[in-house]
Amino acid sequence: MPNSEIGMLLTYLAATADRNMETASSYLSPDVKLVFPQGQFDSLSQMAESMAGRYLSMGKTHDTWDISTAEERTVVVTTGTLHGVNLHGVAFAGVRFCDRFVVRSGLISEQHVWNDLAESGVLDSR
């Protein structure tokens, strides 16, 4: 049911934003593929290590959710904007993002992330 996927994804994203990797990891399949602008990762700990030193906090405001279910998977695409605080303590908002998730058997098997953080310059603002 699509609403259950959205609820699960929101819980997962909140746990990652809060850096509660144990809870967030419980939503991932053992063979998860995490693809971010900084590279591809097989675990949240790898992803978090790569993201360390980029910003102090990050959150998402979701504008759209698109869901497609076929055979044994559900694909969910969400778009919106990022907000947070960079390493210099400067708040930012309004940075575009797009996340694509593949959910199989109730677990996230893929997460693909696109955003305009690098292009926007907000991480370097002082």
Predicted feature residues:
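A short hydrophobic beta-strand element
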Residues: 72-82
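Short solvent-exposed loop/turn micro-motifs enriched in small/polar/acidic residues
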Residues: 7, 60-62, 92-95
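A solvent-exposed, acidic/Ser-Thr-rich amphipathic alpha-helical stretch
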Residues: 21-74
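Short, low-complexity N-terminal intrinsically disordered segments enriched in polar/charged residues
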Residues: 1-26, 30, 125
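Low-complexity, intrinsically disordered terminal/linker segments enriched in charged
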Residues: 110-126
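Short beta-strand segments enriched in hydrophobic/aromatic residues
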Residues: 28, 82-84, 115
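Hydrophobic pocket/interface hotspot
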Residues: 12, 23-25, 32, 47, ...
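Exposed beta-sheet edge and beta->alpha loop/turn motif
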Residues: 81-105
